[in-house]
Each structure stands twice: as structure tokens, then as C-alpha cells.
């Protein structure tokens, strides 16, 4: 995740937490909507893409799920490279 003001970080954390809760409560459309809101707030948030992908898998939207999972993989690789260079 790229540096951002704390209130934006808090907002992102809340969106991800709510997406997770909605997903595990079977509220898939709500989880997807929250995930997309998180992505709009921070397009580098792997967790947001992860929940969007999980929802798509649950709804048998496999092509969309693959696209979101690929973004998760890209961001994880970038984070790993950054951490290795620190």
C-alpha cells in the first residue's frame, strides 16, 4: 500500500474489514461493492482485489475472478521486491 494520510488509511481499513465481514456473512454484492470502493480509494490495495476476486469466484464469474487474482499477484510481487530492496 502506498503512503497516504491516516484518515484515508483508516477508511481503507474499514472498507476492507467490512468487505471481509460481508463476504463471510454471504452478502456477496455488498462485499463486492465495498471491495470496489476500496480499490477506488487505493488502486494498489491487494486485499481489495482479493475480496473482489473471492466474490467473483463465489458468483461463478470466473473470468472476472482471474483478472482480480492476477492483480493480487502483481501487487504481492511488487511488495516483495520493495521489501527485498529495503
Identify the residue ranges that each predicted region occupies.
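Register position in tetratricopeptide repeats
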Residues: 24-25, 58
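TPR-adjacent "capping" and linker segments in tetratricopeptide-repeat scaffold/adaptor proteins
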Residues: 2-14
Amino acid at each position: 500500500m502506498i503512503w497516504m494520510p491516516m484518515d484515508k488509511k483508516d477508511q481503507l481499513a474499514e472498507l476492507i474489514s467490512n468487505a471481509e465481514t460481508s463476504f463471510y456473512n454471504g452478502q456477496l454484492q455488498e462485499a463486492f461493492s465495498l471491495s470496489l470502493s476500496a480499490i477506488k480509494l487505493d488502486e494498489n490495495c491487494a486485499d481489495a482485489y482479493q475480496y473482489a476476486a473471492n466474490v467473483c469466484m463465489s458468483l461463478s464469474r470466473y473470468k472476472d475472478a482471474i483478472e482480480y487474482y492476477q492483480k493480487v499477484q502483481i501487487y504481492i510481487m511488487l511488495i516483495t521486491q520493495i521489501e527485498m530492496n529495503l
